[in-house]
């Protein structure tokens, strides 16, 4: 053998050999199984470039995709940490710490105010990446704060839902957030402001049973799972075979549960048009304070006979 085969060729193979490739360069679509370059997926708002499957986005991505540049995130009120001192296979405080380290969020909701194609809006986005987007006291505080901000700014309130339901580690405290958030949405409506809900995959449990179905306009992303209990639980309880596509956005559209199914690429423009239709030429009632909307109306007194 010559020195070319014994020395030079191995050196060339080493130099041209496979380099270490980061694990996050490619993403496999869960629908069509095609591999997508991560950068292309990010540019396409996490929608598959092959089959148009809408993958789940983070709460911060929702704000970025929806609001114009220059929006402002608001600091949300702090909620009590682990008031029940709950522990299952792991302490609740440890679960919160791990979720915060992983997501860099305080809890399963973020709120910001800004504009959508020039239309003023307050936007809240639930974070499924934070303990499955479960609703506890902190999420309730966030929704109430967002509703109050919308009233004070006389801006529409838009919320992107993504949740597995109430947070079991907070027991009855999490269930209390259902009527609490319902009252918050009513406050927005009494101020004459639009409340728009965008249902994303998945929206289930106590979130579906409360504020998520109370929008003046109900929008869903394609093929989003939307429901209360899971399909298997319903089939086991009713002993009936559910129709194909049950609890998916398109099925709900056909049956009048949602008003429209909108692709992510069209969401900004759609929200802007909806806001314009609901607010142009509308005279809003004068609001001196948020509290004035929540005070119970006292019946008029009649004079004694």
From Swiss-Prot:
Which terms under GO biological process does the entry name?
Answer: fatty acid biosynthetic process; malonyl-CoA biosynthetic process
Q: Per the record, what are the reactions this protein catalyses?
A: N(6)-carboxybiotinyl-L-lysyl-[protein] + acetyl-CoA = N(6)-biotinyl-L-lysyl-[protein] + malonyl-CoA
Is Lyase tagged as a keyword?
Answer: no
Please list the cofactors this protein needs.
Zn(2+)
An example Pfam family from this entry, by short name, is Carboxyl_trans
Database matches in NCBIfam families: accD (TIGR00515)
List the protein's name.
Answer: Acetyl-coenzyme A carboxylase carboxyl transferase subunit beta
What is the species listed in this Swiss-Prot or TrEMBL entry? Granulibacter bethesdensis (strain ATCC BAA-1260 / CGDNIH1)
Q: What is the lineage of its organism?
A: Bacteria, Pseudomonadati, Pseudomonadota, Alphaproteobacteria, Acetobacterales
């Amino acid at each position: 053998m010559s020195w070319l085969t014994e020395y030079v060729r191995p050196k060339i193979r080493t130099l041209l050999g496979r380099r270490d490739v980061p694990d996050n360069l490619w993403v496999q679509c869960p629908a069509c199984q095609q591999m997508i370059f991560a950068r292309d997926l990010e540019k396409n708002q996490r929608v598959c470039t092959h089959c148009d499957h809408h993958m789940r986005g983070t709460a911060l991505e929702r704000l970025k995709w929806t609001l114009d540049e220059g929006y402002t995130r608001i600091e949300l009120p702090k909620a009590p940490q682990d008031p029940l001192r709950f522990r299952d296979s792991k302490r609740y405080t440890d679960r919160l710490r791990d979720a915060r380290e992983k997501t860099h969020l305080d809890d399963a909701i973020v709120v910001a105010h800004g504009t959508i194609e020039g239309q003023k809006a307050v936007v809240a986005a639930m974070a499924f990446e934070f303990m499955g987007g479960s609703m506890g006291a902190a999420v309730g505080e966030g929704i109430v704060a967002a509703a109050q901000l919308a009233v004070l700014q006389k801006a529409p309130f838009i919320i992107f839902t993504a949740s597995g339901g109430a947070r079991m580690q907070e027991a009855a405290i999490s269930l209390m957030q259902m009527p609490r958030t319902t009252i918050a949405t009513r406050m927005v409506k009494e101020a004459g402001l639009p409340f728009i809900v965008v249902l994303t995959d998945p929206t289930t449990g106590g979130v579906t049973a409360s504020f998520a179905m109370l929008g003046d306009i109900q929008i869903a992303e394609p093929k989003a799972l939307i429901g209360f209990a899971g399909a298997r639980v319903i089939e086991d309880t009713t002993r009936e075979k559910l129709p194909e596509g049950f609890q998916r956005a398109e099925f709900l559209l056909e049956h009048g549960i949602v008003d429209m199914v909108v692709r992510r690429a069209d969401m900004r423009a759609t929200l802007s048009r909806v806001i314009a239709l609901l607010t142009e030429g509308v005279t809003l009632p004068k609001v001196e304070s948020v509290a004035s909307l929540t005070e119970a109306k006292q019946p008029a007194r009649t004079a004694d006979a």
